[in-house]
């Protein structure tokens, strides 16, 4: 009843999801060094993630690389590429068979969580991905800890260049983009 207006009706104003599209940015130099292509399937993705985390692509002789990481207080968009591959997107409403359904309760959700759990247990995801603060995460990205990163496509907008993209160009001037 708290949501009801004084005429007894419940009103809502829908909004477009404010989150821009997520993309995966790969370290092409590491893919080249490992003899791998940008993955196009979940099996290929797991193979690339394993190679990045286990085959020392930075060549420093230390087990210190991960497929990717993240930082605290960020929503599930870090993993939208995984959830989406299984037909489930947490926190999103989607059209399915002519109905609007919640992505968090779709049948593929469990399979996506099992897949992510395996990646985590196998050491492919930085175990500090939920505790690092944004500055620590960015420092890890710049220092070459991650072979890929999930980010918002808007960082490649020229208006955001100095805030997001330029620091990585400075850290990896030979990088392909």
Which sequence ranges carry the predicted segments?
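Extracytoplasmic/secretory soluble proteins
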Residues: 1-177
């Amino acid at each position: 009843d708290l949501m009801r207006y004084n005429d007894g009706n419940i009103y809502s104003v829908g909004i477009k999801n404010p989150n821009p599209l997520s993309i995966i940015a790969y370290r092409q130099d590491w893919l080249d060094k490992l003899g791998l292509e940008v993955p196009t399937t979940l099996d290929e993705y797991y193979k690339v993630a394993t190679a990045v985390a286990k085959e020392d692509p930075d060549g420093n002789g230390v087990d210190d690389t991960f497929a990717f990481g993240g930082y605290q207080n960020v929503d599930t968009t870090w993993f939208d590429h995984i959830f989406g591959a299984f037909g489930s997107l947490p926190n999103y409403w989607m059209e399915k068979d002519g109905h609007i359904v919640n992505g968090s309760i779709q049948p593929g959700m469990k399979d996506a969580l099992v897949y992510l759990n395996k990646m985590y247990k196998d050491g492919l995801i930085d175990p500090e991905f939920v505790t690092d603060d944004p500055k620590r995460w960015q420092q890890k990205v710049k220092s070459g800890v991650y072979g890929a990163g999930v980010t918002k496509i808007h960082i490649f907008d020229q208006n955001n260049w100095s805030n997001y993209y330029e620091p990585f160009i400075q850290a990896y001037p030979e990088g392909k983009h």
